[in-house]
A protein has these predicted regions:
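Short, Lys/Arg-enriched N-terminal segments with co-localized hydrophobic residues
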Residues: 1-5
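Conserved Rossmann-like nucleotide-binding pocket used by diverse enzymes
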Residues: 7, 12, 32, 58-60
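A short beta-strand-turn-helix
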Residues: 9-27
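Short pre-active-site segment immediately N-terminal to redox-active cysteine/selenocysteine motifs
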Residues: 24-25, 32-35, 78
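Conserved helix-turn-beta segment immediately C-terminal to the redox Cys motif
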Residues: 24-26, 41-62, 66
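Conserved redox-active cysteine motifs that mediate thiol-disulfide chemistry
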Residues: 31-45
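Short conserved loop adjoining the S-adenosyl-L-methionine
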Residues: 68-72
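Non-catalytic, surface beta->alpha helical segment in thiol-disulfide oxidoreductase systems
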Residues: 78, 83-111
Length: 111
């Protein structure tokens, strides 16, 4: 059996500051829910981006049903919602399913 590398971080209220706000790399956060169809469609796209950019980017996932405080803090009203953080600040936002190329372009703009 091979080693499984964690390419996507589970972000919670407890680790948000360290993993996102204090990150030395840009962070792409996916606000999602397990029951959300478009969220499930987006998941493999984000996984691929995380693997391809692991040295320059962090990808985190926030389950809005479990992390209601974070969902409220970032005014998540529709999911999936992607938020890019750079240097502890929101650099870009996107709501709804997006193809990989659009998300990659959003990340490039934030770098």
């Amino acid at each position: 059996k091979g080693v499984i590398l964690m390419t996507e971080l589970k972000i919670t209220a407890a680790n948000f500051e360290n993993e996102v706000l204090r990150s030395d790399k840009p962070v792409l956060l996916d606000f999602y829910a397990d029951w959300c169809g478009p969220c499930r469609m987006l998941s493999p796209v984000l996984h691929a981006l995380a693997e391809e950019n692991s040295s320059t980017l962090k990808v985190g996932k926030v389950n809005v049903d479990e992390q209601t405080e974070l969902a409220a803090r970032f005014q998540v009203s529709s999911i999936p919602m992607l938020v890019v953080f750079k240097d502890g600040k929101v650099a870009a936002k996107s709501v709804g399913y997006r193809p990989k190329a659009e998300i990659a372009a959003m990340m490039e703009d934030a770098r």
